[in-house]
Amino acid sequence: MRTSQFLLATQKETPSDAVVVSHQLMLRAGMIRKLASGLYTWLPMGLRVLRKVEAIVREEMDAAGALEILMPGIQPAELWQESGRWEQYGPELMRLVDRHNREFCLGPTHEEVITDLARNELNSYKQLPINMYQIQTKFRDEIRPRFGLMRGREFVMKDAYSFHADHASLQVTYDRMHLAYSNIFTRLGLKFRPVEADNGSIGGAGSHEFHVLAESGEDDIVFSDGSDYAANIEKAEAVPREKARPAATEELRLIDTPNAKTIAQLVEGFDLPIEKTVKTLVVHAAEEGKLIALIIRGDHELNEIKASQLEQVASPLVMASEAELRDAIGAGAGSLGPLNLPLPCIIDRSVELMSDFSVGANIDDKHYFGVNWERDLPVPTVADLRNVVAGDPSPDGKGTLEIKRGIEVGHIFQLGTKYSEAMKCQVLGENGKPVNLAMGCYGIGVSRVVAAAIEQNSDENGIIWNDTLAPFQIALIPLRYETDAVREATDKLYAELTAAGFEVLLDDRDKKTSPGIKFADMELIGIPHRIVVSDRGLAEGNLEYKSRTESQPQAIAVADVLSFIQGKVNR
């Protein structure tokens, strides 16, 4: 491809509304253009990368035995009402009414549509298992679209759905898809981690997320330094570092604490170790009209996902208001504690192992110091309530936990029979009786993968593509292309490289575009290999080669360039 025949839309300046690196570089490299909030047009440079991601996803899905289909982007409300998600889904679901006053939505996901297809096309266990996928545009009406393609409203997604006669069959396909996803991200050349995850609004049982490691990631992912254990922050089990509770050494005493409304103020004002304090968080209980207290150590954070999954706690999690606290306890949020609290309590595992700690007295501006379990109050229900922190023991007993930032690019779920029961998706089993189909669901954010790859692979000069994802593998830059010798050598090499199957971008812009601008553009775009043809080099029988990841170019004999490039480019 010659730049004279291509839409080379690079920009020198960074748009003011672009915050993350991938958004900045995709705009500057001429990969995308913004149409409206969260909506982007893919330009030729970007689309070449997107299609490469799609091709690898498609190859691995086909190899895993999945069948490609294509479902409508607009879905009838009746299916969502049947599954129960029409009412459950928030304003992210874009709802439409057609000219006949029938309700539809723009599909953010396709569980309902695929389940409807399965119940109409499958009738016997002999047709199972079956796994179907599509690569299609999705729409979610995000309240604050941001970070370019990282969190847009319209995006390209690969979503697959499998159907099974039993859970054992589902597990086999789930494991196969886990391997397929690992193969996909390995082939894409990304540093990634599969982690245990919560199922969220999709529902069901087991689930794993696939995260590309990047400091700009929105998610904290947790993994052991001594084993394969990995989970996202919502799912990671928090194991106390302490093995046993120390013996009590202090007497219980009631202290006036008028200026200690927060843990930080209590610690600073009374010179307390923060690990000797607790937070008492009151939330709505599962029993309507009731409240329950969740208690964690002062230096820990409540894991709202874990808390909302406790049978005693209302889901979604709702914090008690100040008025509710006053009515139920008679004190404000900054003075609450488990001692003499007229509410049921659940304490975190690490709180159970505390001694000589301080708690709110359930009286405004007062705290108890020197509190000890069993002596001063009984140990209530114990549960895992907190987020893990770096250095915690790994739940599998091997090593300690590390935490890194990640960008979620894939998620696989074992849905079980949630949708098949709601929508009566059944086949006749081996015994001739109807069986609700077990389902799996497997998604990859294809367009997000492109952005995540840039977040992981860029420098101050631009994007750093690997040979697999690069829009072009080679940038061929002639200096003084208007001269006969340079033009002849360039055109000959271009023909040889393209005939050998390389993807080459020949920068044939005229002399008004300086060599420095050409070099800067190709670095910005991130093309992995650069060959420069010049009068001086040709006079010495050489061309100049430079890798995107190297600082210095090297001279290559003209006769050796093709074999040299064949050894450099990973195909």
Swiss-Prot record:
GO terms for biological process: prolyl-tRNA aminoacylation. GO terms for cellular component: cytosol. It catalyses: tRNA(Pro) + L-proline + ATP = L-prolyl-tRNA(Pro) + AMP + diphosphate. It is found in: Cytoplasm. The keyword Nucleotide-binding applies. It is an enzyme of class 6 (ligase). One of its GO terms (molecular function) is ATP binding. Its EC number is 6.1.1.15. CDD domains: ProRS-INS (cd04334), ProRS_anticodon_short (cd00861), ProRS_core_prok (cd00779). Keywords: Aminoacyl-tRNA synthetase, ATP-binding, Cytoplasm, Ligase, Nucleotide-binding, Protein biosynthesis. PANTHER family: MITOCHONDRIAL RIBOSOME PROTEIN L39/PROLYL-TRNA LIGASE FAMILY MEMBER, PROLINE--TRNA LIGASE. Belongs to the class-II aminoacyl-tRNA synthetase family. ProS type 1 subfamily. Consists of three domains: the N-terminal catalytic domain, the editing domain and the C-terminal anticodon-binding domain. Catalyzes the attachment of proline to tRNA(Pro) in a two-step reaction: proline is first activated by ATP to form Pro-AMP and then transferred to the acceptor end of tRNA(Pro). As ProRS can inadvertently accommodate and process non-cognate amino acids such as alanine and cysteine, to avoid such errors it has two additional distinct editing activities against alanine. One activity is designated as 'pretransfer' editing and involves the tRNA(Pro)-independent hydrolysis of activated Ala-AMP. Homodimer. This is Proline--tRNA ligase. It comes from Pseudomonas savastanoi pv. phaseolicola (strain 1448A / Race 6).
